Regions:
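Cytosolic, long alpha-helical scaffolding segments
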Residues: 1-208
Length: 208
């Protein structure tokens, strides 16, 4: 199966664009929550609603896949990309919810840094799906993929630093458990962005 390159956009690409743009919005909203952590109850509630929108988009995409005889690239890759987009949305919403559930009163600087990386990575995810339909823009897509990988690597470094600092400096075991879980969620979110980017890289290589 080859990537289509016609004037009329394939419906799958349109749905992927919508999905990725929604995730970009979630990443931006999460970045705002974590950088200015005041009166965030409404923002977290709104994020739950946006995550539900992503669930709906997954259902529509998979229904379209089930009903389509011809697809722009391998069905298995469409299925995987859909699930990986959903993973990103789930991790972002779950992390925001844990801030509320755990009664977090202030955000650690390392968490703010990882929140900004998530904001940046989800923006690159959105840009990736805007250039993916056009084979002549594969170079642009690969640049987005490389940038997502770079951001994930930065996140790894911040994550390791944050855990080291947490175990060295924090004396309250409950606080350690709470923040270890939050940092792991932040890391999982960046990992999910990288996994998606790697899948799209595979699609580009297979259809070059």
């Amino acid at each position: 199966m080859v990537l289509r390159n016609s004037k009329k956009e394939d419906p799958f690409f349109g749905m992927f664009k919508t999905y990725a743009a929604t995730i970009d919005r979630m990443g931006s909203d999460f970045g705002k929550i974590i950088s200015d952590y005041h009166n965030v109850e409404r923002a977290i509630a709104d994020m739950k609603m946006t995550e539900s929108e992503c669930d709906d988009l997954s259902h529509v995409l998979l229904e379209e896949l089930n009903n389509s005889f011809i697809t722009p690239f391998d069905r298995e890759d469409i299925f995987m990309i859909t699930n990986q987009l959903d993973d990103i949305a789930d991790y972002i919403e779950d992390t925001a919810s844990k801030l509320q559930i755990y009664g977090v009163e202030s955000i650690k600087d390392d968490a703010k840094e990882m929140g900004q990386l998530i904001d940046d990575a989800t923006s690159d995810v959105s840009r990736l799906f805007y250039v993916l339909p056009e084979q002549k823009k594969n170079k642009n897509a690969m640049e987005n993929i490389i940038e997502i990988n770079r951001l994930e690597n930065l996140g790894d470094a911040v994550f390791r630093r944050a855990l080291g600092k947490l175990f060295r400096e924090e004396k309250d075991p409950i606080e350690i458990i709470r923040w270890k879980d939050i940092f792991e969620n932040l890391e999982d979110t960046l990992d999910a962005c990288e996994h998606l980017a790697d899948t799209v890289r595979g699609v580009i290589v297979k259809n070059a």
